[in-house]
């Protein structure tokens, strides 16, 4: 479901980005429904009355939590993470040395970014809407295949006729394996690297419809693990006047870094940046995966990089949360073991009220963004490797573990 985000080329990202922008603007202004065109011409993402932001480290369980919450009938949401829209606007590496965006960074087209962030937002409603899903498929295609000139109007007609996207992609020589909702088997080789957004996992669930003017009274649910490094910037530059509540989702270090280790070693869309040559023990790929923390390294052990990603993300959330008045810390372990009560706590925190559609989803949540079948304490399959990294960890790791209250290994499910 929530497409990881970006793969940006170090060599010529501007050419690729400009091509994606051109095709996206064409779709936004000429291909999607007139109703959606009207919304995007008059409104921006900061026009919502309230925002619920999920902040966590990668492989922290945010995709599952996001998918549950976006089924609440008083919410709106994107179809996945919003990193791709920041990348389209050049607000990413290599413009920055890492995923950290300074709170005072203002050198970007704010109006355009806020409009772009609204481009695929839909409303949770049981009946859903086919045109919404078709429009969202179209606005994402230039980000996913920016170096291809596709007949977007014809693609839209075929989608509305009921032709599957798989069939349409095959017609243009694009393996469906490279797109959303593909088979669980891993690709034999990495996907095309010239993308703004990686294809897998992004989808609009069937209970979403297009935005109307009245929907801005609802709560917008957002999540992207990269937000861990830009919370003050989000508060000051994107939503300075919006009621923003933050859910800090935590997960024990062993399970998180084990999930990261799995994801790095799969050709399944977790690649994010071309940072140059990588010499990481345990990794044979050529692209960086997941978030790019400050102090990232290109040499060493992959398991240590995974630990760094967990530590740095949560350290920055702990530091950046002071920019917000309302922050709720939630354990992913509780989302798994006491789903109903934990979701109820979040719903009350966000002032959302009851939702029959949400209740149904809580009882039978979707399986999203998994690298392997979910299983408690799966990290113990490579316990020696994981603990070797934890034993080498520095003082910052110890401080984060203590602040997040993960000092008892018996609780690391």
Language-model segments: what does each one mean?
Residues 61, 77, 89, 135, ...:
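Small/flexible residues
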Residues 2-201, 365-372, 413:
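PAPS-dependent sulfotransferase catalytic core
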Residues 81-85, 249-252, 358-362:
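A short, structured active-site edge motif that brings together acidic residues
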Residues 56-61, 70, 79, 93-96, ...:
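Generic hydrophobic/packing signal
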Residues 2-52, 265, 270, 278-329, ...:
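PAPS-dependent sulfotransferases, especially Golgi type II membrane carbohydrate sulfotransferases
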Residues 1-15, 112, 116-146, 231-261, ...:
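Charged/polar interaction segments and conserved charged motifs
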Residues 153-357:
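PAPS-dependent sulfotransferase catalytic domain
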């Amino acid at each position: 479901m929530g497409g990881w985000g970006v793969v940006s080329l170090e060599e010529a990202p501007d050419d690729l980005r400009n091509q994606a922008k051109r095709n996206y603007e064409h779709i936004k202004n000429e291909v999607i429904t007139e109703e959606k065109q009207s919304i995007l011409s008059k409104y921006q993402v900061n026009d919502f009355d309230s925002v619920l932001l999920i902040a966590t480290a990668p492989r922290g369980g945010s995709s599952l939590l996001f998918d549950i919450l976006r089924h609440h009938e008083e919410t709106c949401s994107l179809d996945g993470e919003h990193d791709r829209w920041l990348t389209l606007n050049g607000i990413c590496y290599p413009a920055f040395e890492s995923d950290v965006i300074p709170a005072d960074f203002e050198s970007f087209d704010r109006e355009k970014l806020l409009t772009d962030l609204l481009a695929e937002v839909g409303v949770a409603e049981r009946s859903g809407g086919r045109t919404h899903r078709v429009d969202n498929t179209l606005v994402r295609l230039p980000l996913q295949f920016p170096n291809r000139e596709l007949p977007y109007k014809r693609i839209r007609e075929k989608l509305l006729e009921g032709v599957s996207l798989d069939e349409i992609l095959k017609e243009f020589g694009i393996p469906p394996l490279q797109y959303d909702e593909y088979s669980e088997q891993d690709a034999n080789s990495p996907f095309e690297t010239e993308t703004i957004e990686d294809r897998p996992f992004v989808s609009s669930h069937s209970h979403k419809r297009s935005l109307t003017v009245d929907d801005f009274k609802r709560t917008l649910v957002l999540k992207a693990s990269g937000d861990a490094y830009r919370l003050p910037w989000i508060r000051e530059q994107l939503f300075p006047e919006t009621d923003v509540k933050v859910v800090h989702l935590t997960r024990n270090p062993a399970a998180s870094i084990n999930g990261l280790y799995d994801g790095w070693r799969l050709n399944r869309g977790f690649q994010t940046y071309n940072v140059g040559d990588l010499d990481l023990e345990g990794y044979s790929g050529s692209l960086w995966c997941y978030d790019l923390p400050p102090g990232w390294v290109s040499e060493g052990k992959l398991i240590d990089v995974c630990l760094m990603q967990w530590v740095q993300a949560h350290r920055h959330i702990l530091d950046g949360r002071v920019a917000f008045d309302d922050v709720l810390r939630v354990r992913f372990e509780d989302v798994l073991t006491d789903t109903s009560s934990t979701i109820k706590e979040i719903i009350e925190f966000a002032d959302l009220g009851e939702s029959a559609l949400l209740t149904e989803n809580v009882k039978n949540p979707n399986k999203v963004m998994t690298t392997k079948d979910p299983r408690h304490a799966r990290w113990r399959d490579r316990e020696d490797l994981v603990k070797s990294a934890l034993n080498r960890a520095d003082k910052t790791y110890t401080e984060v573990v203590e602040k997040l209250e993960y000092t008892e290994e018996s609780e690391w499910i």
